[in-house]
């Protein structure tokens, strides 16, 4: 019986590209309409005042203003654009 594995293909050796998720604009930062605030999987952050949500759950600014983070309730973080 051979003690070496044959030179066939392996089932491992794959990895997906990083998706660059996360917060892109932080609290207190000035933003313009259309700026991306958060890239996320699922609704980790919920859209608040003057914030829109894309089909991939990306949150973006609807108006110019300053980013503000708060809590909708004990679990859910919300992002607003003030002013």
UniProtKB/Swiss-Prot annotation:
The organism's place on the tree of life at top rank: Eukaryota
A Gene Ontology cellular-component term: chloroplast
Subcellular location(s) per record: Plastid, Chloroplast
Keywords for the protein's UniProt record, in alphabetical order: Chloroplast, Plastid, Ribonucleoprotein, Ribosomal protein
Keyword Kinase: no
Principal cellular location given in the protein's record: plastid
An individual GO BP term: translation
MF-aspect GO terms: structural constituent of ribosome
Region described as Disordered: spans on this chain: 1-24
Pfam families: Ribosomal_L27 (PF01016)
PANTHER family the record matches: LARGE RIBOSOMAL SUBUNIT PROTEIN BL27M (PTHR15893:SF0), RIBOSOMAL PROTEIN L27 (PTHR15893)
Family the UniProt entry places it in: Belongs to the bacterial ribosomal protein bL27 family.
Protein name: Large ribosomal subunit protein bL27c
Organism: Trieres chinensis
């Amino acid at each position: 019986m051979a003690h070496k594995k044959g030179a066939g293909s392996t089932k491992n050796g794959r990895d997906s590209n990083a998706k660059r998720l996360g917060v892109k604009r932080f609290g207190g930062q000035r933003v313009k309409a259309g700026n991306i605030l958060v890239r996320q999987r699922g609704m980790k952050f919920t859209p608040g005042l003057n914030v829109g949500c894309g089909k991939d759950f990306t949150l973006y600014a609807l108006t110019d203003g300053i980013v503000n983070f708060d809590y909708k309730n004990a679990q859910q973080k919300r992002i607003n654009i003030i002013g």
